[in-house]
Amino acid sequence: MNQKLTPSLYRLLLTAALIIAVHTQPTEVAAAEKKFDRSPKNLGSVLVFSGTGWYRHPEVPALSGWLARRDKDLRMQVDVSENPADLVKILNRYKVLVLNNCTEMPALLDEKQRQAVEEWHAAGGGIVALHAALVRQTEWKWFNELAGCDFDSDSEFLEARVVVDPAAAKHPTVSGHGTSFKYTADWTNHDRSVSGIKGFQVLLRVDESSYEPVRELFQKRGGKAMGKDHPIAWLNTNGGGRFFYTELGHDVRSLETPFGKQHIVEAIRWAAGLKPTSSK
């Protein structure tokens, strides 16, 4: 049935709409402000940064979500950003910066933003770098030295034999899994090994004889395997703060395992200077 919209009916409907708008707008605005509130009282201890300057893997957002959902395991609030400006504005309020596959940061971050990260780390901030966070970083000398190496090539998503460094057997990020174990991930080859660098401690290596270390794409481009000494997770305690890197984190499936969760949760707590979750 079609009813003609008379002037009086139109005024009535308009008045009703204005009343509804007046009463609902403050609530909606307040909810939005609360959702995006970045005041110190509403910030957590961990900032997951997922900005990228080069290739951006489609699973980066899913990984940020996965990391945010580790808050209960971590016993720490986790915030997420991909805005480089946040590294200047709010980084100093956090204990840990997680670099979620942040490729080629020199192309993404300006000098002021890079300096903010350097000063924050020198003052004791902890950095946890995942997988592609060591891709194309050589133009940022400070970060390249902090990480110890850069990207060369990688494998397909394959099962491989992972070996725990004997000196690291009790470290909370790798403990409880014996001297070696099988694990499936995308394994990265670096342009050098960090073994023996002062201040670095290798936690895990991958046995290249247990998988094909260079996938076909990179074989055609001259990609090289690392050989017998292929670190895949390590620490660096040089420079004031703590640094942790792991090759895991190409996508969620490489982390959504008991070991993957332990590895990342304990890495973040270690970077924050906190005791392992197993400690009372």
Regions found by a protein language model. Name each.
Residues 45-49, 91-137, 240:
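Short alpha-beta junction capping motif
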Residues 149, 154-239:
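Catalytic beta-strand/loop cores that center a nucleophilic Ser/Cys/Thr
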Residues 31-94, 276:
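Aromatic-Pro/Gly-enriched surface loop or interdomain linker
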Residues 24-32:
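Boundary at the C-terminal end of the N-terminal hydrophobic targeting segment
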Residues 1-8:
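N-terminal secretory signal peptides that target proteins for export/translocation
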Residues 11-25:
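Bacterial N-terminal signal peptides
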Residues 32-44, 69, 73, 92, ...:
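Extracellular ligand-binding/catalytic regions of CAZymes and related secreted enzymes
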